[in-house]
UniProtKB/Swiss-Prot annotation:
<comment type="similarity">
    <text>Belongs to the neurotoxin 14 (magi-1) family. 01 (HNTX-16) subfamily.</text>
</comment>
<dbReference type="GO" id="GO:0005576">
    <property type="term" value="C:extracellular region"/>
</dbReference>
<keyword id="KW-0732">Signal</keyword>
<dbReference type="InterPro" id="IPR012627">
    <property type="entry name" value="Toxin_22"/>
</dbReference>
<keyword id="KW-0800">Toxin</keyword>
<keyword id="KW-0964">Secreted</keyword>
<dbReference type="Pfam" id="PF08092">
    <property type="entry name" value="Toxin_22"/>
</dbReference>
<feature type="disulfide bond">
    <location>
        <begin position="82"/>
        <end position="95"/>
    </location>
</feature>
<keyword id="KW-0960">Knottin</keyword>
<dbReference type="GO" id="GO:0090729">
    <property type="term" value="F:toxin activity"/>
</dbReference>
<feature type="compositionally biased region" description="Basic and acidic residues">
    <location>
        <begin position="60"/>
        <end position="69"/>
    </location>
</feature>
<feature type="disulfide bond">
    <location>
        <begin position="75"/>
        <end position="90"/>
    </location>
</feature>
<protein>
    <recommendedName>
        <fullName>U11-theraphotoxin-Hhn1a</fullName>
    </recommendedName>
</protein>
<comment type="function">
    <text>Probable ion channel inhibitor.</text>
</comment>
<feature type="disulfide bond">
    <location>
        <begin position="89"/>
        <end position="110"/>
    </location>
</feature>
<keyword id="KW-0872">Ion channel impairing toxin</keyword>
<dbReference type="GO" id="GO:0019871">
    <property type="term" value="F:sodium channel inhibitor activity"/>
</dbReference>
Length: 113
């Protein structure tokens, strides 16, 4: 009977206890790798953030250049009624009282200067 017990201990208990030790070692190795991976991810994240900030700065610079050179928007064209107090006529146009054909409307229109 003793040989059966010894055999049982050798065959079943010893591998289980060694397997648990390996499991603990594997767990420690995984923790080390994840810590290394986190530091690598932090580095990669910072690098990506720097690149995105540079790209954003370039895009904002281009937008400001476009806004300086772009044409006037939301203005009233020629022959369109306008408000005498708040004229929004496009550049090159003036808000004037109509002559002849538009007198009966009692309104101001955008005309060329």
């Amino acid at each position: 009977m003793n040989t059966v017990r010894v055999t049982f201990l050798l065959v079943f208990v010893l591998p289980v206890s060694l397997g648990q030790a390996d499991k603990d070692e594997n767990r420690m190795e995984m923790q080390e790798k994840t810590e290394q991976g986190k530091s690598y991810l932090d580095f990669a994240e910072n690098l990506l953030l720097q690149k995105l900030e540079e790209l954003e700065a370039k895009l904002l610079e281009e937008d400001s250049e476009e806004s300086r050179n772009s044409r006037q928007k939301r203005c009233i064209g020629e022959g369109v009624p306008c408000d005498e107090n708040d004229p929004r006529c496009c550049s090159g146009l003036v808000c004037l009282k109509p002559t002849l054909h538009g007198i009966w409307y009692k309104s101001y229109y955008c005309y060329k200067k």
